[in-house]
């Protein structure tokens, strides 16, 4: 058992091989075992990542009063700035030690999904802010849909199965700032143990130590991606669709120790969602003898709102 624990690690795959049978087999095994995978050669340009992150480092360095001008009271953190002391992991008594910004999908006036998606918040004082945010959102979105072609093949579905089910999803790009730790101990951690609500999450910026995944054996496994790599995990919506065949795994971001406690941490998760009116119901191939009893169907938007209330964003 000890030897198995020592060898446990999150697999690393190259997105350049996404169409190969080997990639499909490997990502399927990773998601059944861990719910997580590390992706290299993801195709998001480093220049775009650096430009995007630099803009938010500028914003998060502003004073609290300056930042709160971009917080939408009563908006549930759907867009713009969410300050410290609000988001709390499901079942936790302590809020997460982070502040963040949300960017959503841009839809034209009159679009039938507009009432599901709040308007984005833009900062005129930061050059190219809107342009860069939209470019980053769209790039993440394309990358996620490309990964979903492999996940569809894992499930013995057509590669384009997910395309019309996520192309107008209420997906969210979040930019998180975890500040340097205070000198006094705290009961809160940077991000309490939780599962993601959505279909899949694509995460950049996980190189700084702290991200951990809860294994089937009930042990916390550190995720250590190479610089520039992306971490991609299964969310609760995909777990529900597959009746648990693909795992939405508890994960957390623990507080750093020693000199690392002096470092801020920035990360960029993209939460890819189904279209709001997509009914999440267990796939027929994931139901039957030896499988769990499936949960009842629920619309993606209803499920999202239910879960947002649990984490105190509603």
Regions found by a protein language model. Name each.
Residues 1-314:
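Peripheral, non-catalytic segments flanking oxidoreductase cores
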